C-alpha cells in the first residue's frame, strides 16, 4: 500500500508542479516561448504577485483528490465505501457544474466549492464539461 500511496502522491505533485510552471506557455510554439523567455525557454515559475495561477487542470486535480479522500474517509468512518470511481465521478460533476455559466451544483460534497480560486471559470471545453456532468460517470467501469 505504501508504494501505491507514494506513486499517487508523486503523480499529483508532478501534475501540480507541471501545471504551475507550464500554464503560461500552454498552446504556444517553441519559437514563441523562446521569444518571451530566452533561448532556453521557461526555466522557472512565471508568478503573478508572487503566486502561480490556478488553472482548470489544477482545479480538476484538486476535485479528483477530494473525491478520493471523500471515499477513503467514508470507508474509514463508516466501514463501507463504493468503488473510488463513484466518488471521483461525483467530484468531477461538481467541478464541471462550477465551470458552467449558471453556477454551482445544488448538492455539494466538495468543500473546494467554497474556495473561489478553485471555482473560477477556466474550462471552456463543452465536450469535456458535458462528459463530466453525466450522472453515469464511472458506472461502465463498475459493472465490468
Regions found by a protein language model. Give the residues of each.
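Structured, active/binding-site neighborhoods that engage oxygen-rich ligands
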Residues: 1-142
Amino acid at each position: 500500500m505504501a508504494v501505491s500511496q507514494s506513486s499517487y502522491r508523486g503523480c499529483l505533485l508532478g501534475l501540480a508542479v507541471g501545471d504551475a510552471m507550464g500554464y503560461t506557455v500552454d498552446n504556444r510554439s517553441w519559437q514563441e516561448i523562446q521569444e518571451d523567455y530566452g533561448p532556453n525557454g521557461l526555466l522557472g515559475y512565471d508568478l503573478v504577485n508572487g503566486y502561480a495561477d490556478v488553472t482548470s487542470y489544477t482545479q480538476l486535480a484538486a476535485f479528483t483528490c477530494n473525491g478520493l479522500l471523500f471515499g477513503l474517509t467514508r470507508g474509514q468512518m463508516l466501514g463501507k465505501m463504493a468503488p473510488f470511481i463513484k466518488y471521483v465521478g461525483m467530484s468531477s460533476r461538481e467541478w464541471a457544474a462550477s465551470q458552467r455559466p449558471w453556477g454551482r451544483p445544488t448538492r455539494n460534497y466538495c468543500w473546494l466549492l467554497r474556495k473561489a480560486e478553485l471555482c473560477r471559470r477556466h474550462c471552456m471545453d463543452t465536450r469535456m464539461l458535458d462528459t463530466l456532468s453525466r450522472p453515469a460517470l464511472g458506472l461502465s467501469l463498475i459493472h465490468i
